[in-house]
From Swiss-Prot:
Residues annotated as binding Fe cation: 306, 308, 385
Iron found in the keyword field: yes
Cellular location(s): Nucleus; Nucleus, Nucleoplasm; Cytoplasm
Disruption phenotype: Viable. Adults have circadian rhythms with reduced period length and increased rhythm power. Adults also display increased daytime activity and reduced daytime sleep.
Record-given protein name: Jumonji C domain-containing protein 5
Cofactor: Fe(2+)
Expression across tissues: Expressed in neurons close to the dorsal lateral neurons involved in circadian rhythm.
Record keywords: Cytoplasm, Hydrolase, Iron, Metal-binding, Nucleus, Oxidoreductase
SUPFAM superfamilies for this protein: Clavaminate synthase-like
Gene name linked to the record: JMJD5
Organism: Drosophila melanogaster (Fruit fly)
Domain JmjC: 255-401
Lineage per the UniProt record: Eukaryota, Metazoa, Ecdysozoa, Arthropoda, Hexapoda
Catalysed reactions listed for this entry: L-arginyl-[protein] + 2-oxoglutarate + O2 = (3R)-3-hydroxy-L-arginyl-[protein] + succinate + CO2
Function in brief: Bifunctional enzyme that acts both as an endopeptidase and 2-oxoglutarate-dependent monooxygenase. May be involved in regulation of behavior and circadian rhythms.
Length: 401
C-alpha cells in the first residue's frame, strides 16, 4: 500500500458530512459508515474486515444503479445519485486495497466514469480529480486497438449562408450585432489558436488521451426516433467502430458522442480548447458557469430540429455540418412534440419537409449554412436548429446565460 494511496484516503468525506447526505437511508447509512470507519482505521494501521465491507459497498453500488435505471433519469432523486457516486468512490478504494495492477486501475477508472455519468459528484470534486490523477498515473492499460487514421483537413468550400457572417468580431461588435440583436451569426477566424484544430485530426491522439474512458454513446438515426438508444462504452471501442480503417459493416449503426461534458471528465482535452471571450457577455448580474459539450461522430449523425434555452456557440474543430435554423416565432409552425421530454424538439424533418402532414411548415422561414472547420455559429436562446454532419466531425458547444 503506497503512501500516495493513503493520502488519497484523506480526501474521502468524513462520516459527519456523509450523514447529512444519507439521512433517512438506513442501508446506505450503515454501509457507508462502516466503509468510512474502515478506511479511517486503515490510516492507523488496521486492515481487518476489508473483504466483507468491500462486498457491502459493492452491493450498495448495485442497488442504487438499479434505482437510477428505473424510470426516466431526470426523475431520479438526487440523494440516490449522490449515494451511488460516493459508494462508487468507496468501491474504488476497496478494489485498490486488493490490487493496484494496471488492469485493476482500468476497472476502477471505469467505475469512476460511471460515478460521474450517473451519479452526482459535485460535493466531492477534489476527490474526483485526485482519483483521476492516481488512476491515470503510469497509464492504466496498454491500448490494444488497431491504429486509427489521421484525418485530412477539409479544404474550405464556398457555400451559401443565409445568416450574417462576421470575421473575428470584437466583443463590442458581437454584443451589439449578435447578442443584443438576437441574431444568429456565423463567426469566422475566432478559434484559429486552438491546438485542437490540428491535434484532434490525429485520432490516435484522442485514443491515447481518452481511449480507456467510458462515455455515453447515442445509437440510432437521432434521439427523437423510436429505435434510438444509449450505451456506456469505452472511447477506444467507439473510435474503432466509427473511424477505424476497416470499412464499416453494412447496416452498422451510426454512433454519436453527443452533448457530453467530455472536458470535465477528461481535463487533458480541455487544454486543447479555450472558452471564447464572447461567452462572458451576459444579461445576468452574476453569470453562471459556461456549459461545455462535446459532439463527436462519423458522417451522417443528425440532431433533429430543436432549440436550447441558453445562448449557444457551436464551434467546429474538424469535419463539417449542414445546419438549418428557424426563429422562435415559428415555434407553432414546427410542430413541437407533446411529450414533456421532447417539448423542445420538432416533429418535422427539416431536411425533408412534408407539407401534407405538417401544412403549417410552409409558413416557416428557414436559414441554411455549412459550418466548416474553425467556424463558430452563434445561436440565441430558443432558436430552432437542425444539424447533420457531412463528414466525420468533432464540434464543441458553449452554452451560457
Amino acid at each position: 500500500m503506497d503512501s500516495e494511496f493513503l493520502e488519497l484516503t484523506q480526501l474521502l468525506p468524513r462520516w459527519v458530512d456523509l450523514e447529512n447526505v444519507v439521512r433517512g437511508e438506513v442501508e446506505a447509512r450503515y454501509i457507508l459508515k462502516r466503509a468510512a470507519d474502515h478506511l479511517a482505521n486503515l490510516r492507523s494501521g488496521g486492515d481487518s474486515g476489508a473483504e466483507e465491507t468491500g462486498y457491502l459497498v459493492g452491493a450498495l453500488v448495485d442497488r442504487n444503479w438499479e434505482r437510477i435505471h428505473t424510470g426516466h433519469f431526470s426523475q431520479v432523486p438526487l440523494v440516490t445519485r449522490k449515494i451511488y457516486a460516493i459508494a462508487c468512490c468507496f468501491k474504488i478504494f476497496f478494489l485498490l486495497l486488493e490490487s493496484t495492477s494496471p488492469a485493476q486501475k482500468d476497472a476502477c477508472s471505469e467505475i469512476l466514469d460511471e460515478a460521474q455519468l450517473l451519479g452526482c459528484m459535485e460535493d466531492w470534486s477534489e476527490l474526483k480529480v485526485a482519483l483521476m490523477d492516481y488512476l491515470d498515473k503510469d497509464g492504466a492499460v496498454a491500448l490494444n486497438s488497431a491504429p486509427l487514421p489521421t484525418l485530412e483537413p477539409l479544404t474550405r468550400v464556398t457555400s451559401n449562408c443565409d445568416i450574417p457572417q462576421l470575421d473575428a468580431p470584437s466583443l463590442e461588435e458581437f454584443q451589439t450585432k449578435c447578442f443584443e440583436a438576437g441574431q444568429p451569426t456565423l463567426l469566422l477566424n475566432t478559434i484559429q489558436h486552438w491546438p485542437a484544430l490540428h491535434k484532434w485530426l490525429d485520432l490516435n491522439y484522442l485514443l491515447q488521451v481518452a481511449g480507456n474512458r467510458t462515455v455515453p454513446i447515442e445509437i440510432g438515426s437521432n434521439y427523437a426516433s423510436d429505435e434510438w438508444s444509449q450505451q456506456l462504452v469505452k472511447i477506444r471501442d467507439f473510435l474503432s467502430r466509427q473511424f477505424g480503417k476497416e470499412p464499416s459493416k453494412a447496416g452498422q449503426n451510426i454512433e454519436y458522442l453527443a452533448q457530453h461534458e467530455l472536458f470535465a471528465q477528461i481535463p487533458a482535452l480541455k487544454e486543447d480548447i479555450s472558452i471564447p471571450d464572447y461567452c462572458t457577455i451576459s444579461n445576468e448580474d452574476t453569470p453562471g458557469a459556461v456549459d461545455i459539450k462535446a459532439w463527436l461522430g462519423p458522417a451522417g449523425t443528425v440532431s433533429p430540429m430543436h432549440y436550447d434555452p441558453k445562448h449557444n456557440l457551436l464551434c467546429q474543430v474538424f469535419g463539417s455540418k449542414r445546419i438549418i435554423l428557424a426563429a422562435p416565432a415559428d415555434t407553432d409552425n414546427l410542430y413541437p412534440h407533446d411529450s414533456e421530454f421532447l417539448a423542445n424538439t420538432a416533429r418535422i424533418d427539416a431536411a425533408q419537409l412534408d407539407p401534407e402532414t405538417y401544412p403549417l411548415v410552409a409558413k416557416v422561414k428557414f436559414y441554411q449554412l455549412l459550418l466548416q472547420p474553425g467556424d463558430c455559429l452563434y445561436m440565441p436562446p430558443k432558436w430552432w436548429h437542425y444539424v447533420r454532419s457531412e463528414a466525420p466531425s468533432f464540434s464543441v458547444s458553449f452554452w451560457w446565460e
